[in-house]
Amino acid sequence: MITIKKGLELPIAGGPEQVIHNGPAIRHVATLGEEYIGLRPTMKIKVGDKVQKGQVLFEDKKNLGVKYTALASGTILEINRGARRVLQSVVIAVEGDDSVAFAQYDADKLDTLDAQVVRDNLIDSGLWTALRTRPFSKVPAVDATAAGIFVTAIDTQPLAADPVVVIAQHKEDFANGLKVLARLTEGKVYLCKAQGADIPAANAQVQEFAGKHPAGLAGTHIHHVLPASATRTVWHIGYQDVIAFGQLFTQGVLNTERVVAIGGPKAKKPRLVRTVLGASMAELTADETVGDGVRVISGSVLSGRTAVGPQAYLGRYHQQVSVLEEGDEKELFGWAMPGVDKFSITRSFLGHLSPSRLFNMTTSTGGSDRAMVPIGNYERVMPLDILPTMLLRDLLSGDFDGAVRLGALELDEEDLALCTFVCPGKYDYGSYLRDCLDTIEREG
């Protein structure tokens, strides 16, 4: 077992009840183009077309052969594009339950399936996009290989669902999904889970993690078990997608069900909700928030994105919905107040005198932008064997060669989310990291 000692358990109010409830009926779903880094789509549909669940919507010009399929049957309602014609979302008005039938196999034969057969079925169904690479956090090429595949079956994000609760309802499908994954690599499949978690391992190698967040991030697991580099690529996948893999191969259907945690200080009844991938956030959170001036976030409060406009839909890789108050009110002389109701990692406020207290946090950054100030905050929350202050400095200054030498290729935006949270300078280090990774990949 690997214990993570550095990190942060964010004391935020609104933790969800770990019981799964049925969510509201979803009338609109969307595939979000900007979630797929570097995507240049070749559209196979147009507005007004009728589609079946699992039908191809578009393919990627830059990653030939990768297919993106419909998350529900219905009618193409919108194809939204942003600046420079970047695809933002393809919205489907849900109608009926027509679905494309895919190849299915006996569960006891999954261990012996031909690797190319497995790839073809995943690609045709669109589930290939559930896999992501390190370095670069992109959907792998259809002919790519991985030194190992990591299954993230532990979640330490604030307000997250317990994977054990979700997997308990699909243990056989999860085990079958692990068998499918094993056919994709000559290396090992690593099942990363919490200490003592009751999760079937099938033929995967179990690696247990304990400790503070980010003990549940794929980047943490990869760094400690099989580090990625310019010469070694590994893949990772979420536990609910592993369940979908198992159902695809044994039932021949594309399962787009997703259990998400709805939580946060402004959530009316924090709990786990069964919904679908790409669900409209307006429909999913209807009657779920308290009061006005609320921000709905797809994903974690640390690394999620605001669900608004053409992107107001549940993200492909997100397993929670966070609800916070918009922190747009300024507090006169707030810096001089005792702050008994405020949290600070540096113990600047008296809130630290109540270590078990949960805080009604808002979206406020607690001040304006300023210079980067290295006072030890980054080292407190970074459990990886890197020099965070030096790495972040190189990212801000544009010294990407230096950033790579310090370990940038191992990281994703979510791995630097805690550094962003504790930064006195209010920098979003994730965006600087993405600029670095894009530049390194482009220039080789």
Swiss-Prot record:
GO BP: sodium ion transport
Keyword Transport: yes
E.C. numbers: 7.2.1.1
Catalysis performed (reactions): a ubiquinone + n Na(+)(in) + NADH + H(+) = a ubiquinol + n Na(+)(out) + NAD(+)
Source taxon at top rank: Bacteria
A GO molecular-function descriptor: oxidoreductase activity, acting on NAD(P)H, quinone or similar compound as acceptor
Enzyme class: translocase
Keywords: Ion transport, NAD, Sodium, Sodium transport, Translocase, Transport, Ubiquinone
Job of this protein: NQR complex catalyzes the reduction of ubiquinone-1 to ubiquinol by two successive reactions, coupled with the transport of Na(+) ions from the cytoplasm to the periplasm. NqrA to NqrE are probably involved in the second step, the conversion of ubisemiquinone to ubiquinol.
PANTHER family in the record: NA(+)-TRANSLOCATING NADH-QUINONE REDUCTASE SUBUNIT A
Sequence similarity: Belongs to the NqrA family.
Assembly notes: Composed of six subunits; NqrA, NqrB, NqrC, NqrD, NqrE and NqrF.
Protein's recorded name: Na(+)-translocating NADH-quinone reductase subunit A
Originating species: Shewanella frigidimarina (strain NCIMB 400)
